[in-house]
């Protein structure tokens, strides 16, 4: 069991896309991908593929992303 064995590759890919959207100031795309991330977390939790610490970590990630997006102003 590795140091980050709780990580889920699919969720990490979606989270990475959200980060890219935020860095590029693509607020609409970031919000869509945050929703996708939440839905995927819920689906994996319901199927038993995501448990315990991982659920909390990914939910915290979603909360952080939402806070960043809500505090970001469009620059165009």
Language-model regions: role of each:
Residues 1-32, 70:
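N-terminal acidic leader/helix
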Residues 18-25, 41-48, 72, 76:
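Secondary-structure edge/capping motif, primarily at the C-terminal ends of alpha-helices
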Residues 58-76:
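Alpha-helical linker/edge segments of TPR/alpha-solenoid repeat scaffolds
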Residues 10-13, 17, 36, 57-64:
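Charged, amphipathic alpha-helical oligomerization/scaffolding segments
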């Amino acid at each position: 069991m590795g140091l980050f064995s709780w990580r889920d590759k699919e969720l990490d890919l979606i989270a990475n896309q959200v980060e890219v959207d935020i860095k590029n100031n693509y607020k609409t795309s970031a919000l869509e991908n945050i929703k996708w991330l939440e839905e995927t977390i819920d689906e994996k939790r319901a199927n038993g593929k995501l448990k315990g610490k991982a659920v909390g970590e990914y939910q915290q990630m979603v909360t952080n992303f939402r806070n960043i997006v809500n505090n970001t102003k469009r620059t165009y």
